[in-house]
Amino acid sequence: MPELPEVETVRKGLEKLLNDFYIERIEVLKERSIASNGGSKSFIDNVKNSYLGNWERRGKYLIGSLLTKEKFSKGFLVVHLRMTGQFKLLEKEVLACKHTRVRFFEERGRELRFIDIRNFGQMWHVPSSRSVPEIVSGIKRLGPEPFSDDFNSHYLEEYLKKKTRSIKSALLDQRTVAGVGNIYADETLFDAGINPKTESRNLKSNELKRLCNSLIKILNISIGEGGTTFSDFRDLEGGNGNYGGQALVYRRSGKNCKKCGEKILREKICGRSTHWCPNCQK
């Protein structure tokens, strides 16, 4: 699943390439891609005849502002890519490929296409009279953004002080911190030198400081590399993310640790494959 760096890469592409994109027509090829009330008909009626304005990211959600030709608000287009969702910008209309789910056409002929092999991705229209969390309930449950002032070691110490689950499990919980998934949880814990099986409540203040610093560091590096592509992720122009080649533990089970030479382990923690070094992460 695309995590924060991949979603941020898509957000940057959408904002850069679609700042003058006027949606004249929409085709919904898969009804389940539309999650807002009223289904595809209501979605099309509310989103067409709109300019795509600024794009924001909240956790793994993309939030695009919709504007009239007079630049008044028409609400928001909210997207969650889930496992395999991706956007592709085409300079002219071409036949839809097999996994095309939603197509946005502009008056000049360009097409913004939403492709989703697994078909778990979702879209919502949020009217200007409502807030995004009112319509997209998952956003209400998100913890702080890693780059926000609200995310720090003091917050983690308070939030985790009674949590008996592993720190790996806590990082994957979007209520702890928004946008982190398996790749960056593993890489962060390695960088911070923390055993992923450690009970969250047992982490000391200095370890939580390292954890915060490592998470921000790893996410910034990955954003700079356009995210990670191991299977389906592509940016708006079809390019791969380049962080995967820099990963120190993720998908390196059985290989030598680049820091100490110990074999990288892979085991299930909280039902997820976890990669870590037993020497560097004690």
Swiss-Prot record:
Keyword Transcription regulation: no
SMART domains cross-referenced by the UniProt entry: Fapy_DNA_glyco (SM00898), H2TH (SM01232)
Catalytic activity line of the entry: Hydrolysis of DNA containing ring-opened 7-methylguanine residues, releasing 2,6-diamino-4-hydroxy-5-(N-methyl)formamidopyrimidine; 2'-deoxyribonucleotide-(2'-deoxyribose 5'-phosphate)-2'-deoxyribonucleotide-DNA = a 3'-end 2'-deoxyribonucleotide-(2,3-dehydro-2,3-deoxyribose 5'-phosphate)-DNA + a 5'-end 5'-phospho-2'-deoxyribonucleoside-DNA + H(+)
Keyword Disulfide bond: no
Subunit organization: Monomer.
Domain of life (superkingdom): Bacteria
NCBIfam families: fpg, PRK01103.1, PRK13945.1
Gene3D superfamilies the record matches: 1.10.8.50, MutM-like, N-terminal
Family: Belongs to the FPG family.
Keyword tags: DNA damage, DNA repair, DNA-binding, Glycosidase, Hydrolase, Lyase, Metal-binding, Multifunctional enzyme, Zinc, Zinc-finger
E.C. number: 3.2.2.23, 4.2.99.18
Sequence positions that bind DNA: H99, R118, K163
Residues annotated as the enzyme's active site: P2, E3, K60, R272
Cofactor section: Zn(2+)
Zinc fingers (FPG-type), renumbered ranges: 248-282
Designated name of the protein: Formamidopyrimidine-DNA glycosylase
GO MF term set: 8-oxo-7,8-dihydroguanine DNA N-glycosylase activity; class I DNA-(apurinic or apyrimidinic site) endonuclease activity; damaged DNA binding; zinc ion binding
GO biological process: base-excision repair
Cofactor binding mode and count: Binds 1 zinc ion per subunit.
Physiological role: Involved in base excision repair of DNA damaged by oxidation or by mutagenic agents. Acts as a DNA glycosylase that recognizes and removes damaged bases. Has a preference for oxidized purines, such as 7,8-dihydro-8-oxoguanine (8-oxoG). Has AP (apurinic/apyrimidinic) lyase activity and introduces nicks in the DNA strand. Cleaves the DNA backbone by beta-delta elimination to generate a single-strand break at the site of the removed base with both 3'- and 5'-phosphates.
Pfam families in UniProt: Fapy_DNA_glyco, H2TH, zf-FPG_IleRS
Source species taxonomy: Bacteria, Bacillati, Cyanobacteriota, Cyanophyceae, Synechococcales
